[in-house]
Amino acid sequence: MSQADRTAGLDPDNWDELRAQGHRMLDDMLDNLSTLRERPLWQAPTPEQRARCRVALPRGPGRLEDVHAQFMADVAPYGSGNRHPGFMGWVQGGGTAVGMLAEMLAGGLDANLGGRDHMPIEVERQVVAWMAELFGFGPEASGLFMTGTSVANLCAVLIARDRALGADVRHTGVRDVGVVAYASKGVHSCIIRAMDMTGLGWDRLRLIETDADHAISLPALEAAIAADRAAGLKPFLIVGTAGSVDVGAIDDLAGLADIAAREGAAFHVDGALGALGVLAPEIAPRLAGIERADSLALDFHKLGQAPYDAGFLLVRDAAAHQRTFTYSEAAYLRHAERGLAGGEWWPCDFGPDLSRGFRALKVWFQLKTYGLDALGAVIGQVCALAQTLAERVAASPELELVAPVGLNIVCFAYKGADNAAIVADLHDAGRVAPSTTTLNGRTAIRAAIVNHRTEPQDIDALVEGVLALGRAQAARG
């Protein structure tokens, strides 16, 4: 019976043919990864390619090799470019071949890590234990893989909310309660959105002024807390940033931990970008205080170089973490003493998802394959390249730094030019791809150096490209 004649069942008629096709697909992607420099970083899909993608809903079967051929022709060459060594536009890692292979294994297992007793969950538990050790949270900490730090930060705000308002808030909902959270003006927008989604509201988040290094001003924070206390409000959460989205600034985490302890507020660190800097000896001292956080969010798909997506939440108090998410009334989620429904803690009791993919596997593979020292060396390398870029900018009379370089992000401008147009032209050229941001009302070129493949030649290409385009603008008047 052919695939076309089947009424049910999706396994192939011929496993050998599928195996051969699978090998071709794997070889194609390994070839693709190993030749990134030979192709444009980014190119816009043509109208014809978009049209070929926008077809009627397929009712009948197709040939896997034809779908693969379309992918290689119309999809693979037109990605966002973050794997390319010249990509510096947004804070995205470059992925790894090891991570890609691990994703293949995870897809083959098709494990749901929502709960129950199976080894894929043990892999996630092991990574949680490693992160608890790395960040000094201790063996009683809990953690969970998530899509990204946006969701991890949301969960951290929920945990802090329930800590302040009590478990009954899960039953009664948020009423007119006098609690307030604090973060710097450079905090990621997902913290602001989390205040909305947790029912607390944007008005209960104080965005505090930053200092010359774009880190939160501790005196301004203390003044805001004093004003809120005088108005009868209670601080419940202080958010520190380890690598701000615009400039890579790192807040004084130890100072924030002191203030949070004094005020009885939860201390959360958004470490999406910079938390893994603890692996780099030259960066780690600047993250002092991160080990005192009540919760920490980070992304392995940034400086950790894991393929998307691999967000992570670490929580010091596992019991408080579980109280925020567990729901014991669902009979279909009842734990058993033995059998498949047994096992230790279930991830679904520590987060919003019942259906969870095997995100932990690619991180587990990378940590075991490369080791922490190699990952730390990559982080040190990209931060050193950022300093190299800053030095190149400072040495050019046509360019200027727009912000201090705190980690791996360099914000600069071509003096008197349309810098947004320069960035767009660089994208179209396909060699390097920074992004733009706005600092103090000015448009700046923002180079976020994250990719483990980026080398000094890519820094040279960026500087030379900006200079050439800026000079061309000036010549046109």
Task: Please report, for each region that a protein language model flagged, where it lies by residue.
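N-terminal entrance/gating region of PLP-dependent enzymes' catalytic architecture
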Residues: 2-140, 432, 448, 454, ...
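A short linear hydrophobic-aromatic micro-motif
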Residues: 141, 397-401, 431-436
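A common structural junction motif
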Residues: 333, 427-434, 467-474
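Conserved PLP-binding catalytic core of the aspartate aminotransferase-like
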Residues: 400-426
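Active-site C-terminal subdomain of aminotransferase-like
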Residues: 263, 288-394
